[in-house]
């Protein structure tokens, strides 16, 4: 190497470390989560130069400049028309009233009555209900998905939406720009040309060349005529119905009727304002239901704006409130320290805590990261079940035969801190019983991970898991 080349390389080396140290100081001054700060320091040390690119795309915060602020969120929620029963909180079991208050304060999530609830654990049944809902629409159809692909399932739904738009039904669709980045723009344009209102969330032309990539709308919501709605983990793609790579797809959706649908509607219309700058409101979008059952739900949203993470905060409170059992399902398990400690605390307090994750998910890296977290929870007595019946994509929590949650939220850093997520927290014995039965049915397709098996992992696997864990806040 010539002297000039050596000088250039030396200059680049010192320039890199000057920039890296400046960024590290900047991160520390933000008072960010310690785990995230350490993760970025490890990136700069072990992946020099390339680490700067990773930080540019995934580490810089565009929240203040490009995402709606906390004040705007509050104003939008206040302008949404919701008829709220002020006595509802007194009608749920007393031990959960503090949780309902927490959601009201952290996410302005009203406690709304449920006339009918159906837990859908078969994705083919989800597809049937979806097309039934679309077919029955008289006034409006609102859909929001992270993924909406132009395959057989997606094309069939597109045709159904177009047909309804031509009948004069208002049809609005929000899809995530990154989740659908492989879908040709002509697919969505064909819907627009037919009268469907279509918007993408935080449009990214080149997903890997923008730090907008970091903040995605992961919500899955369907609302028809303000009277019936669905929420859960399913997107619009063939693999959600037919499976993937020879594996069946196991997911959960929750169909709701009654005032609780207004919570789904509110979430959708706030996001609609984000993407279209058009405020849609009025009583025709928020009809008043009978509320004939002593069943209630709160539709809770979380986003990267502000400091409160309402959904994960709700999970932490559920773990603290649990007395008999709490069962959790998630496809990806990379939790933050607070949730992890809460999980262990519940188990060490005598609660039957069961965690179900896929034995093999659709992400090998996520599987390695998940395994690195399981040692602590196993030592605390948490029962970990590895689902081998296919791709487990269900995101559910059920507690003590009364309280349950179904939504889009994974138990990982991305869902907790970066994504726009939504989950329904339901106060109802029948829904809890159905989710409990579903969990126990899934458990038959699992194997229990033992402490001995976990400790006998190969040295190479343990090293790989520990290394990937360093980057779990970034995955």
Q: Over which residues does each language-model region extend?
A:
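CN hydrolase (nitrilase-like) catalytic-core segments centered on the catalytic cysteine
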Residues: 369, 381
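Active-site donor-binding acidic/aromatic loop of nucleotide-activated sugar
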Residues: 384-388
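Catalytic-core elements of nucleic-acid end-processing and repair enzymes
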Residues: 395
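N-terminal localization/anchoring segments of enzymes in phospholipid and broader phosphate metabolism
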Residues: 1-313, 317, 321, 361, ...
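Helical hairpin unit composed of two closely spaced alpha helices linked by a short loop
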Residues: 322-324, 332-354, 358-359, 363-365
